[in-house]
């Protein structure tokens, strides 16, 4: 049975349990699917693997979906949008870029975007970055969490853009990653959402070695950190 299209309106019961939507396809024609829980006014958008060679966030977000389904009190007064695999082309090919060789996290319509061979022909030239932009426009999230991994030799950290300092520090209370303001990358989702739209956005930079962990180990290591983002400013239970 296919997932419903993005434009279809699910029932309240289905939204409570997590409604899947196909929101479009990648440049390589792979469906991109989000899961939406609830329909409350406090909105959190969590995405992973916009860089396909940073895969650890995908099983972490999928485990988050399982946790929400078994703890439906998290949905009270909230909408939670999960995008476990933002760059399926790169994920399959184990590369940073999509199938067209574009770094999706340099393809957003941010005021600091620069033209380069790997940033796309123009802002939002890629279907994946357009899809993420459309999700933001439709749901107007109160906060965005984008899961990444640092490169070999670089320590993991919690980066942020826009008015997200307090959120980043709250998340840091539940894991061993420090808050480290890395600076707004040109054309990144952080720059677009945090600086242009003034939406608090955290770039959660996990460690390179986290790719070697099982899904359960990832959840034990970082699950409560994601829950802290969802329940912010209330502490997670």
Residue ranges of model-derived segments:
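Active-site-adjacent mobile loop/cap segments within catalytic or ligand-binding domains
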Residues: 156, 186-237
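Short glycine- and acidic-rich boundary segments immediately preceding or forming the N-terminal edge
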Residues: 1-33
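Active-site/substrate-binding loop(s) of hydrolase catalytic cores
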Residues: 41-47, 54-182, 208, 213-214
């Amino acid at each position: 049975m296919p997932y419903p299209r993005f434009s279809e309106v699910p029932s309240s019961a289905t939204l409570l349990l997590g409604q899947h939507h196909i929101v479009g396809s990648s440049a390589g024609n792979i469906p991109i699917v989000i899961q939406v829980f609830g329909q409350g006014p406090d909105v959190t958008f969590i995405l992973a693997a916009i860089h396909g060679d940073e895969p650890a966030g995908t099983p972490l977000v999928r485990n988050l979906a399982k946790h929400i389904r078994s703890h439906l009190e998290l949905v009270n007064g909230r909408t939670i949008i999960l995008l476990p695999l933002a760059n399926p082309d790169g994920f399959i090919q184990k590369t940073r870029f999509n199938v067209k060789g574009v770094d999706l996290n340099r393809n957003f319509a941010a005021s600091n975007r620069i033209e380069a061979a790997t940033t796309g022909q123009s802002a939002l030239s890629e279907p994946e970055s357009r899809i993420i932009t459309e999700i933001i426009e439709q749901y107007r999230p109160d906060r965005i969490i984008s899961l990444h991994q640092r490169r070999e030799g670089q320590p993991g950290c919690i980066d942020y853009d826009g008015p997200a300092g307090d959120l980043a520090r709250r998340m840091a209370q539940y894991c061993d990653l420090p808050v480290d303001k890395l600076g707004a990358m040109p054309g990144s989702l952080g720059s677009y959402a945090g600086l242009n739209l003034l939406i608090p956005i955290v770039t959660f930079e996990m460690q390179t070695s986290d790719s070697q962990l099982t899904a359960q180990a990832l959840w034990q290591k970082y699950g409560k950190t994601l829950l802290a983002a969802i329940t912010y400013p209330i502490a997670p239970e």
